[in-house]
Curated annotation (Swiss-Prot):
Post-translational modification Phosphoserine, affected residues: 100
This protein's name: Phosphoglucosamine mutase
Required cofactor names: Mg(2+)
Record gene name: glmM
Name of a matching Pfam family: PGM_PMM_I
Lineage: Bacteria, Pseudomonadati, Pseudomonadota, Gammaproteobacteria, Alteromonadales
Reactions that this protein is recorded to catalyse: alpha-D-glucosamine 1-phosphate = D-glucosamine 6-phosphate
Cofactor note: Binds 1 Mg(2+) ion per subunit.
Role summary: Catalyzes the conversion of glucosamine-6-phosphate to glucosamine-1-phosphate.
Post-translational modifications: Activated by phosphorylation.
Cellular component GO terms held in the UniProt record: cytosol
């Protein structure tokens, strides 16, 4: 039974629950104990731009050093950059200090293995077992050393650009890039600018507090307005740690993760390089399923979370998968979700077909989908309550085969997520609120 690790590492409000300096120190030590048994005894640490990153970086650094591991600091860098540099430095592990799309007062810690993928469940459980033991520092001559990777940003920028076909250029394209005041603020604009685009940046002035605040992939209003006002060809919105992407076409319409998956799958199929099909999640829009089916592209759903998308991709030996929230995996171009690289792959498809973003999405019709988050911090499971089950069954009967209902607990926040999908937007919204009220009545 997991006590500390959730579906995406450890995450919570800073100074409360799990996210304390004491736990970070002990976690660094416990992870160091497990990781030092094999390999290079070298660990990379990256973080996003939230103010508490300094605190947790220092605590993790001290804990790892106390266990005898050498630490290499990257400073503010996107999560996928940590995965990439963990591989290229042959480090034993990479550590990301980030709460992704959450507000600044939250933070989290997650690990990558030496190949840039997320740690196996068994390794996380082994770390949890070490956490229960008293901290014992190694002898002084065995303590780890700490250094800084001075050219981390430049290395990752070149890696990102390497995913764009050399025979094409972004010359003539005007792109709005929203960095969410997060870890991509000094990376993403340079990548697209160096590939030839005219880049207008927003969300590129982090102050430790403003990460994800009214900007980024979870708040699309500002980028939509900017794309229209600047008469840009498209917009690319990243989240606080750069592992997810949402896009905006020139008319200000949001292009979400499902539509991005459709673009990438069609492009790969047209080039004859699509291996198998596409993995989505239980939250993926039914429209994606139908659009892929029309092109004879297999589609499978995993549980929600990029960890589970990756598991199903490996099980089926497919390459492309992701979530409608914008986590996009393409295993021919990396080992984890990468917002910048996903954007580059969409732009490459546009260049190959000499098509606009809206033209690339003409073949997919998204069904109205409403997601309602209900805060629930009780100890019992509201999804098993008779009143909630009854409300769900009632809605499902009304939707028939042209809709879906999905209720699930968030893996990272004290929320119950209510998703309803169907043909008529107003009905879908009413159905979602009806079920949400049944859950709220239990609080």
């Amino acid at each position: 039974m997991r006590k500390f690790f959730g579906t995406d590492g450890i995450r919570g409000k800073v100074g409360a629950g799990k996210m304390t300096p004491e736990l970070a120190l002990k976690l660094g030590w416990a992870a160091g104990r497990v990781l030092s048994r094999t390999g290079t005894k070298k660990v990379i640490i990256g973080k996003d731009t939230r103010i508490s990153g300094y605190l947790f970086e220092s605590a993790m650094e001290a804990g790892l050093s106390a266990a005898g591991l050498n630490v290499m600091l990257m400073g503010p860098m996107p999560t996928p950059a940590v995965a990439y540099l963990t591989r290229t430095f042959r480090a034993e592990a990479g550590v990301v200090i980030s709460a992704s799309h959450n507000p600044y007062y939250d933070n989290g810690i997650k690990f990558f293995s030496t190949d840039g993928s997320k740690l196996d469940d068994e390794v996380e459980l082994e770390i949890e077992r070490e956490l229960e033991k008293p901290l014992e520092c190694v002898e002084s001559h065995l303590l780890g050393k700490v250094s800084r990777i001075e050219d981390a940003a430049g290395r990752y920028i070149e890696y990102c650009k390497g995913n764009f076909p050399a025979e094409h250029t972004l010359n003539g394209l005007k792109i709005v890039v929203d960095c969410a005041h997060g870890a991509t603020y000094h990376i993403a604009p340079s990548v697209f600018r160096e590939l030839g685009a005219e880049v207008i940046t927003i969300g590129d002035k982090p102050d430790g507090i403003n990460i994800n605040h009214e900007v980024g992939a979870t708040s699309m209003g500002k980028i939509r307005e900017t794309v229209i006002a600047e008469k840009a060809d498209l917009g690319i919105a990243l989240d606080g740690d750069g592992d997810r992407i949402m896009m905006v076409n020139r008319h200000g319409k949001v292009i979400d993760g499902d539509e991005i998956l459709y673009i990438l799958a069609c492009d790969a199929q047209d080039r004859g390089v699509l291996k198998g099909g596409v993995v989505g999640t239980l939250m993926s829009n039914l429209g994606l399923d139908l659009a892929l089916k029309a092109r004879d592209i297999p589609f499978a759903r995993s549980k929600v979370g990029d960890r589970y998308v990756m598991e199903l991709l490996k099980e089926k030996d497919w390459r492309i998968g992701g979530e409608n929230s914008g986590h996009i995996l393409n295993l021919d171009h990396g080992t984890t979700g990468d917002g910048i690289v996903a954007g580059i792959l969409v732009l490459a498809a546009m260049c190959r077909k000499q098509a606009t973003l809206e033209e690339l999405t003409e073949g997919i019709k998204m069904l109205p989908q409403v997601l309602v988050n209900v805060r629930f911090e009780g100890t019992h499971n509201p999804l098993e309550a008779d009143s909630v089950l009854s409300a769900q069954a009632e809605v499902e009967a009304k939707l028939g085969e042209r809709g879906r209902v999905l209720l699930r607990k968030s893996g990272t926040e004290p929320l119950i997520r209510v998703m309803v999908e169907g043909d008529v937007a107003s009905d879908v919204k009413a159905h979602a609120n009806y079920i949400a009220e049944a859950i709220k009545a239990l609080v």
